[in-house]
């Protein structure tokens, strides 16, 4: 089925133009042993780490939004991936949204990123480090054609494919969300080494960035993991379904009311905000 095209700039909706959520009132990580609680789209985190904004291997975008918090496993993954990318001469890794100090629901742009286990990473690898002005107002590089059926050849590179593959081969990573056209190109380029493609999942938008998701940490007992992706490389009928015309009578699903918070997250809000 053909998926509805959504504007790339939706990922960059300014929080200033949207109503704040209670989670934005928590300005520092909640003290305690690191615990991811609930699901990726309905949860929170205790004991989040702050990603250092200064690094030789990566740069953090939109630091004014203060979305550079996550579980210590996520911080270590970013440091690990960017070091590997630098060792291979790929360029500087550009880090987008992680989570807020206590996780929880954003005021716009994301439904996930709530448990400190998601990170958005730009699919461009500058050889020259970006200025502060560029980092505060990053310009996304749309890799997908206007019709959504393939990548733009002049913008695609083997370095981008290598970055995605490096992330997918990390043992802590369970899913990487990219545009269907990007997944399709990865399938074409992969050759015989294809096991890592299982983790790369086609999804709406994601035309200029990938969203990397880690597994629930073993000691986060209230964290809800997703089932593993289906076996195989995901390059067959499932992927092709994203490029098919919509079925007759297909309508846009109604916007759902957010579910109740996990009790531990509600208790956290009650203590620190309400």
Curated annotation (Swiss-Prot):
Binds 2 Zn(2+) ions per subunit. Zn(2+) ion 1 is bound in the active site. Zn(2+) ion 2 is bound at the dimer interface by residues from both subunits. One of its GO terms (cellular component) is outer membrane-bounded periplasmic space. Gene3D superfamilies: 3.30.1380.10. The keyword Iron-sulfur does not apply. One of its GO terms (molecular function) is metal ion binding. Its cofactor is Zn(2+). Keywords: Disulfide bond, Hydrolase, Metal-binding, Metalloprotease, Periplasm, Protease, Signal, Zinc. Pfam families: Peptidase_M74 (PF03411). Its EC number is 3.4.24.-. It is found in: Periplasm. InterPro entries: Hedgehog_sig/DD-Pept_Zn-bd_sf, Peptidase_M74. Zn(2+) 2 binds at residues 147, 150. Residues 225-274 are annotated as: Disordered. Residues 1-19 form the signal peptide. Zn(2+) 1 binds at residues 110, 113, 120. The keyword Ribosomal protein does not apply. Disulfide bonds join 44-265, 187-235, 216-223. One of its GO terms (biological process) is proteolysis. Belongs to the peptidase M74 family. Murein endopeptidase that cleaves the D-alanyl-meso-2,6-diamino-pimelyl amide bond that connects peptidoglycan strands. Likely plays a role in the removal of murein from the sacculus. Dimer. This is Penicillin-insensitive murein endopeptidase. The lineage of its organism: Bacteria, Pseudomonadati, Pseudomonadota, Gammaproteobacteria, Enterobacterales. The gene is mepA.
């Amino acid at each position: 089925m053909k998926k509805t095209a959504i504007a790339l700039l939706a990922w960059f909706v300014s929080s200033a133009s949207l109503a704040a959520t209670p989670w934005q009132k928590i300005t520092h990580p909640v003290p305690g042993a690191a615990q991811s609680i609930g699901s990726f789209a309905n949860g929170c985190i205790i004991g989040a780490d702050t990603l250092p904004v200064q690094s030789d291997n990566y740069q953090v975008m939109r630091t004014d939004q203060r979305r550079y918090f996550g579980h210590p496993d996520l911080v270590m993954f970013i440091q690990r991936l960017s070091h590997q990318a630098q060792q291979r001469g790929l360029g500087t890794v550009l880090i987008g949204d992680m989570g807020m100090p206590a996780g929880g629901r954003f005021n716009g742009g994301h439904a996930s990123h709530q448990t400190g286990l998601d990170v958005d990473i730009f699919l461009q690898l500058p050889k020259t480090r970006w200025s502060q002005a560029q980092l505060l107002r990053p310009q996304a590089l749309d890799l997908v054609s206007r019709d959504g059926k393939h990548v733009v050849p002049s913008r695609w590179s083997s370095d981008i494919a290598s970055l995605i593959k490096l992330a997918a081969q990390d043992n802590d990573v369970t899913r990487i969300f990219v545009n269907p056209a990007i997944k399709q190109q990865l399938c074409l380029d992969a050759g015989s080494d294809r096991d890592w493609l299982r983790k790369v999942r086609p999804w709406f938008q994601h035309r200029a960035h990938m969203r990397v998701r880690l597994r629930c940490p073993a000691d986060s007992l209230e964290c809800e993991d997703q089932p593993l992706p289906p076996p195989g490389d995901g390059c067959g009928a499932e992927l092709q379904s994203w490029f098919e015309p919509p079925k007759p009578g297909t309508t846009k699903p109604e916007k759902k009311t957010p579910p109740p918070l996990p009790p531990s997250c509600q208790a956290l809000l009650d203590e620190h905000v309400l």
